[in-house]
Amino acid sequence: MRVKVILACTECKQRNYNTMKNKKNNPNRLEIKKYCPFCNKHTVHKQTK
């Protein structure tokens, strides 16, 4: 089952990205290193509630 998730920057807490996640393959919270336009650098983005 694929669900829509929101990714937030760990440094500035801005919610920058929306993505899809397969709950069966990834039951834990998603963590991806992506570009944050507010920090102007690549940071770790975590899945929000």
UniProtKB/Swiss-Prot annotation:
| Similarity comment | Belongs to the bacterial ribosomal protein bL33 family.
Mind listing the GO biological process terms from this record? translation
What Gene Ontology terms describe where this protein resides (cellular component)?
Answer: cytoplasm; ribonucleoprotein complex; ribosome
GO MF terms here are:
structural constituent of ribosome
Keyword annotations for this protein, in alphabetical order, are: Ribonucleoprotein, Ribosomal protein
Looking up InterPro entries in the UniProt record yields: Ribosomal_bL33, Ribosomal_bL33_CS, Ribosomal_bL33_sf, Ribosomal_zn-bd
Record keyword Calcium present: no
Q: PANTHER family, alphabetically?
A: 50S RIBOSOMAL PROTEIN L33, CHLOROPLASTIC (PTHR43168), LARGE RIBOSOMAL SUBUNIT PROTEIN BL33C (PTHR43168:SF2)
Q: Its gene?
A: rpmG
**Record-given protein name:** Large ribosomal subunit protein bL33
What organism does the UniProt record list as the source?
Clostridium kluyveri (strain ATCC 8527 / DSM 555 / NBRC 12016 / NCIMB 10680 / K1)
Instruction: Provide an example Pfam family for this protein.
Output: Ribosomal_L33
Q: Which HAMAP family match?
A: Ribosomal_bL33 (MF_00294)
